[in-house]
Amino acid sequence: MKLNKYIDHTLLKQDAKKKQIDSLLSEAREYGFASVCVNPTWVEHAKKGLEGTDVKVCTVVGFPLGATTSTVKAFETKEAIQNGADEIDMVINVGALKSGDLALVESDIRAVVEASGDKLVKVIIEACLLTDQEKVLACQLAQKAGADFVKTSTGFSTGGATIADVRLMRETVGPDMGVKAAGGARSYADALTFVEAGATRIGTSAGVAILKGELADGDY
């Protein structure tokens, strides 16, 4: 198994400096991760820094709360793609889901999917805030709206990925949709366990440490 190709090498901290982004890009080039995941302001810089590699540029939309309007999320998506983004990680409208407004949740996801064209869309359900029933509903709505992946977490709420959540999400969406575990893998063993549970992508700031077999600091 080429575990590096499961990893979205991530730096989403609001105080990230250019030199830290450059370090992220350098590590991505060296280790050949699936993607780097950065905030929208860094997309253009990341695209240039990864020229000549097969590492994708992933960015976030409606992040981290998911509480912007669908129009804003669609605009963010289009601009990110214009700037070079290959993949979009969007946050659902969590409040709408918990209020039972499933039509709004679905249309919100669909707005981003339609704005993304042929680019990959991952839907962050923020599992730590949801009941198991709500997790299932969120995954079903993401699938119905045409997204490519469901993703556990933003890394900015009360918890990250759990094995139980990844397993539930995989059982819900079946074998043909991606599942991204974010915020729970701190070691090589953690990463393998998530993959065995059904994850096809792992979002982490600790990709290098994981591949080296070291225990990473931090919780994303």
UniProtKB/Swiss-Prot annotation:
Alphabetical GO CC annotations of the entry are: cytoplasm
Check the record and name the InterPro entries matching this protein.
Answer: Aldolase_TIM, DeoC, DeoC/FbaB/LacD_aldolase, DeoC_typeI
Q: In which pathway does it act?
A: Carbohydrate degradation; 2-deoxy-D-ribose 1-phosphate degradation; D-glyceraldehyde 3-phosphate and acetaldehyde from 2-deoxy-alpha-D-ribose 1-phosphate: step 2/2
Biological process, per Gene Ontology: 2-deoxyribose 1-phosphate catabolic process; carbohydrate catabolic process; deoxyribonucleotide catabolic process
Q: So what does this thing catalyse?
A: 2-deoxy-D-ribose 5-phosphate = D-glyceraldehyde 3-phosphate + acetaldehyde
Q: Which UniProt keywords apply?
A: Cytoplasm, Lyase, Schiff base
| Catalytic residue list | 89 (proton donor/acceptor), 151 (schiff-base intermediate with acetaldehyde), 180 (proton donor/acceptor)
Q: Where is the protein found, in the record's own terms?
A: Cytoplasm
A molecular function annotated in GO for this UniProt entry is: deoxyribose-phosphate aldolase activity
Question: Which CDD domains does this one have?
Answer: DeoC
Write down the EC number: 4.1.2.4
Q: Name one Pfam family in it.
A: DeoC
- Keyword 4Fe-4S: yes or no? no
Q: Which family does it belong to?
A: Belongs to the DeoC/FbaB aldolase family. DeoC type 1 subfamily.
Q: What does this protein do?
A: Catalyzes a reversible aldol reaction between acetaldehyde and D-glyceraldehyde 3-phosphate to generate 2-deoxy-D-ribose 5-phosphate.
Question: What PANTHER family does the entry give?
Answer: DEOXYRIBOSE-PHOSPHATE ALDOLASE
What protein name is recorded for this chain? Deoxyribose-phosphate aldolase
